[in-house]
Amino acid sequence: MSLVSAALFGLLQALTEFLPVSSTAHLLVFGELLGHSLDDRRFRAFVTIIQAGTTLAVLVYFRADIARLVAAAARGLARGRPFGTPEARLGWYIVLGTVPAALAGKLLEHRIEALGNWVIAGSLVALGLVLLAAERLASHRRRVEDVGAGDALLIGVAQALALVPGSSRSGTTITGGMLLGFTREAAARFSFLLSVPITLAAGAYKLWSTVPDLRGEAAWTVATVVGTVVSAVAGYLVIDWLLAWLRTRTTYVFVVWRLAAGAAIAALILSGVLPAGAEAPPPPPPALHAAP
């Protein structure tokens, strides 16, 4: 892989991991179009490892929030009042919201990996329509401080749906938050915070299992470093841009993006450019790793 291609993959990972449009779908299709097969262990390792860059972007961008939530939860435990403050409660609600995706990932990982490109196209369209419904029907009034245990669990279930390629981890969780009445920005902010435990755990597991595939592959190793750095830097900027966008604008642009991407993938399948089935298992969805 050339360094230009590696940088483009890193940029694509950053854009589609945080925007509610599915990084899995875009990385898979872009890779297929450039002739990179997931049968190639080096490419699979590359796709998996560059997602560490976007995980790092979340950690850096929300470092103050994460430190505050962890400290509050620790103080609450030490004082025998784990839910004594709003910040401590939010920290534990994030842990609670992580449970559904962790269980689903463990139980369904290999079945999910057998799904093909028609599923990606269908997920892009279906979740795009759900996002449209959330945009039009939700109240958009609640703040992050209003998150309760039930909200965290329901949004956690939405996060588990991101295991389906094409659904998007950020897409399912932001949509879930909006359907529960949260503002667009609050839904996105909670979505990003909720991603931290699962992406760290899944990322560590995937890194451990895929890094050996790059041993002795100097060119691929350099390309992977470039892609990871680009995804980290661009990911930080995308988070900042998305939160600013959602403060004053709607998600309609992402609805259109999802519908157009789903239609384009379907057309590529029908024309024979893309295979219909999963000839090789897709990379795990970015958030879990997951499908964002």
Curated annotation (Swiss-Prot):
UniProt keyword Transmembrane helix, yes or no: yes
List where in the cell it is found.
Answer: Cell inner membrane
Q: Which positions, given as ranges, span the membrane?
A: 1-21, 46-66, 90-110, 114-134, 192-212, 225-245, 253-273
Q: Which reaction does it catalyse?
A: di-trans,octa-cis-undecaprenyl diphosphate + H2O = di-trans,octa-cis-undecaprenyl phosphate + phosphate + H(+)
Q: Which UniProt keywords apply?
A: Antibiotic resistance, Cell inner membrane, Cell membrane, Cell shape, Cell wall biogenesis/degradation, Hydrolase, Membrane, Peptidoglycan synthesis, Transmembrane, Transmembrane helix
EC annotation from Swiss-Prot or TrEMBL: 3.6.1.27
How does the protein associate with the membrane? Multi-pass membrane protein
Gene Ontology MF: a single term: undecaprenyl-diphosphatase activity
Keyword Magnesium in the entry? The reply is no
Q: What else is known?
A: Bacitracin is thought to be involved in the inhibition of peptidoglycan synthesis by sequestering undecaprenyl diphosphate, thereby reducing the pool of lipid carrier available.
Function comment? Catalyzes the dephosphorylation of undecaprenyl diphosphate (UPP). Confers resistance to bacitracin.
Similarity annotation = Belongs to the UppP family.
PANTHER family found in the cross-reference section: UNDECAPRENYL-DIPHOSPHATASE
Q: Which HAMAP family match?
A: Undec_diphosphatase (MF_01006)
What protein is this chain from?
Undecaprenyl-diphosphatase
